[in-house]
Amino acid sequence: MSAITARSQVAHISTRFLLISDTHSASPEQKPQGSQNVSQLPLPKADVLLHCGDLTMIGTLLEYEKTLDLLGSIDADLKLVIAGNHDISLDEVYYRRKGQSMQRHTGGYSEDLPAKARELWLGERAKSAGVTYLEEGTHSFTLKNGARLRVE
């Protein structure tokens, strides 16, 4: 008798990631104040775009809308977004505690801003732009190229 060992073959699928962060609602063609290195459009095509936080300067709805427009213009099959420390209205508890003092000088404080911000990132406009807002937890995706991605 002979033993037969079965090996599973793991497929290697080439996958391009585009990682950006700290855009602070500026498009790559704008140079944010104090910035020394800003990418230029068009950004390269990617299988996965991951925006790693600081979508805005202070978390206003107008800033989120500008960032969503930018993300919608990028050629990527999967566009993932996580909030950063500047995106204060996406953390409702923190916003209620600190938002008023942080947004006082802009006149941007609004009791309903956290709900409006969440609706923007979880609603139809984000879906139409191909953007998925990631909240805490584990998220799994199957990419168009067949690769599987798990974000924890």
Where are these predicted regions, by residue range?
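N-terminal active-site segment of His-dependent metallophosphoesterases
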Residues: 1-78, 87-89
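Beta-strand-turn-beta hairpins that frame and shape the catalytic cleft
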Residues: 7-17, 139-151
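A short linear-motif detector with a strong N-terminal bias
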Residues: 16, 59-61, 110-113, 128-130, ...
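A generic structural micro-environment signature
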Residues: 26, 61, 96, 139-140
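Extended, compositionally biased low-complexity polar/Lys-Gly-rich tracts
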Residues: 39-53, 124-141, 149-152
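Active-site neighborhood of divalent metal-dependent phosphoester bond hydrolases
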Residues: 69, 73-139
